[in-house]
């Protein structure tokens, strides 16, 4: 058996290809993960309502496939979502993903605003007139008299165990103020 010298690779000519011509190898599992991510994106698109879909930049074929998937149930729906994932692989999904993220973010902002308004309303009812300056500081357009009367009525309703009509009116009023401010 012939033994090769340790420096036998030194005689092999180096590959002089530029880095630009280099082929990037992608593993099979990475391709599968990407395909699964696109299928999940397709599922999210199918779960959206009609109004939300109008805000997302989709071509006619993809929109038709999504609308069809919304009508189908069970196994046919799964196959249709697979098709949508395949269609997404052939498209630039970045604008679609960006629009979807904006929709989700808008929803999250709205939810956090509602929680903030609910906390403010609860504070108004618990503290009464002492909390009104805080509301006026946040919303300078607020009517002090209307706010005070709503708070008093809500406190009376709460004490008498009546339905919380003024309680809801305070929230509606605060929501109107928040919308005007935006």
From Swiss-Prot:
One of its GO terms (biological process) is assembly of large subunit precursor of preribosome. GO terms for molecular function: ribosome binding; rRNA binding. GO terms for cellular component: cytosol. Keywords: Cytoplasm, Ribosome biogenesis, RNA-binding, rRNA-binding. Its main location: cytoplasm. It comes from the Bacteria. Gene3D superfamilies: PSPTO4464-like domains. Coiled coil: none annotated. It is found in: Cytoplasm. Belongs to the DarP family. Member of a network of 50S ribosomal subunit biogenesis factors which assembles along the 30S-50S interface, preventing incorrect 23S rRNA structures from forming. Promotes peptidyl transferase center (PTC) maturation. This is Dual-action ribosomal maturation protein DarP. It comes from Yersinia pseudotuberculosis serotype O:1b (strain IP 31758). The lineage of its organism: Bacteria, Pseudomonadati, Pseudomonadota, Gammaproteobacteria, Enterobacterales. The gene is darP.
